[in-house]
């Protein structure tokens, strides 16, 4: 009745056909649990590709600021970032994204965008942050330096660098840990099965060759 996906690294490539097949596999489910706990980040392109499958329309996802001088606060005015829905199979049933303090970088951005969607609930713990675009260089002494060069703001122009709070905070209990039970997944399942109004995924947007499979 409930679909479950764990995505542990946004550096791992995600193909469009893989996403099509995933949503078809879960088409009879009441909702999906999308688990990104302990995901340290990776490629923003993968984050966007997945997020597009949950959109109904083009949305403002946030803002980015670029360095324009040597001063501490010499940044450009916030530049808006937008994301459009995929032209393939999209999912509009309930989704619960599981997070914890080990969600960084592209994962932080993924959560920042997904929480804007009305059918998505963020559950677990605050993310780790670190959402700015990274810059890497080498000092004359041979040391490598990596830092966030372009601050990213959310759709309300608030900094996300220090993490994003969940819609519903859930922590692992000692009792469940001793039993090998995942408190957060159990809470997500209970929420999805609680009887929310559901909508069907748009099968018309999937390619004919995938439907034939």
Please describe what each predicted stretch is.
Residues 1, 25-28, 87-92, 115, ...:
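Extracellular/periplasmic catalytic domains that process cell-envelope and extracellular macromolecules
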Residues 115, 122-139, 145-147, 153, ...:
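C-terminal soluble interaction/assembly domains
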Residues 1-32, 36-62, 76, 80, ...:
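Flexible, low-complexity junctional segments that flank or bridge functional domains
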Residues 85-86, 167-208:
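Extracytoplasmic/peripheral linker and loop segments enriched in polar/acidic and small residues
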Residues 9-17, 41-48, 89, 101-108, ...:
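Soluble non-cytosolic domains of exported or imported proteins
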Residues 41-94, 132-138, 149, 153, ...:
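Gly/Ser/Thr-rich loop/hinge elements
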Residues 94-116, 120-128:
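Extended C-terminal subregions enriched in glycine
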Residues 6-10, 35-38, 64-67, 98-102, ...:
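Active-site-proximal beta-strand/loop segments in catalytic clefts of secreted hydrolases
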